[in-house]
Regions:
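Glycine-rich phosphate/pyrophosphate-handling loop used in enzymes and phosphotransfer proteins
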Residues: 1-211
Length: 211
């Protein structure tokens, strides 16, 4: 099985694994060949959500949005891991969270390939999407986009093209942290546009964000 990294990138990550072994995205314990830390697994189970959360599109005027899903509540070890990925430069944490998201939402079995967690391919017949699009970052100062890193294993497992440049942010807006659902929707309204419309026009898009 091939992973979702190019060969040079995979070799570079293998070298880093020798010096800096894989760690749990929640508590940073060394994982070895385990997909998740045995200590944090029950903590994650406590934060699990239902498989799909349907939005009231008539209330929020999101007619183009079919639904939304989150594998975990944004609390505890999940919140800590996402904040480290966003603000402490732990890009690897974003990838590990993406692997876990893929396993929880789509039932992909995670295997180890050259010391990397790789979700097994999921049958495309039951997926119903044409592409995976990560939400653009508010700032590029961290050097990477957290939703894009999370979307990499997801796109691999679903055998879908990952389109990181399909959307662009046209205004920064306020930080979403601490905002209510209605405030988040108002804050995000008009903040993005299709940078390359031909990539997503008429497509069923699986949009990925970190929170």
């Amino acid at each position: 099985m091939t992973g979702y990294y190019s060969c040079p990138a995979r070799l570079a990550r293998q070298m880093r694994q020798l010096l800096f072994p894989r760690r749990c995205p929640c508590c940073r314990r060394v994982l070895g060949t385990l997909p998740l830390c045995e200590v944090c697994t029950p903590r994650l189970e406590e934060l699990r959500r239902g498989p799909v959360m349907r939005l009231d599109v008539s209330r929020h005027y999101l007619g183009a949005l079919d639904g939304a899903a989150a594998p975990y509540r944004y609390e505890g070890v999940v919140r800590s891991a996402i904040l480290r990925a966003k603000y402490e430069g732990e890009s690897w944490t974003a990838v590990e969270l993406g692997v876990e998201m893929t396993a929880r939402l789509f039932g992909a079995e995670v295997e180890m390939h050259f010391a990397e967690p790789v979700p097994g391919l999921v049958s495309g017949a039951a997926i119903g999407y044409d592409c995976v699009v990560p939400v653009p970052a508010t700032s590029r100062r961290r050097g990477y986009n957290v939703p894009e890193r999370m979307a990499q294993p997801l796109a691999h497992a679903l055998s879908l093209p990952l389109l990181p440049k399909a959307l662009c942010r046209v205004r920064a807006g306020r930080h979403q942290a601490g905002l209510s659902l209605d405030e988040r929707l108002e804050n995000a309204a008009g903040a993005f546009r299709a940078q390359e419309p031909e990539l997503v026009e008429g497509k069923r898009v699986l949009l990925v964000d970190d929170v």
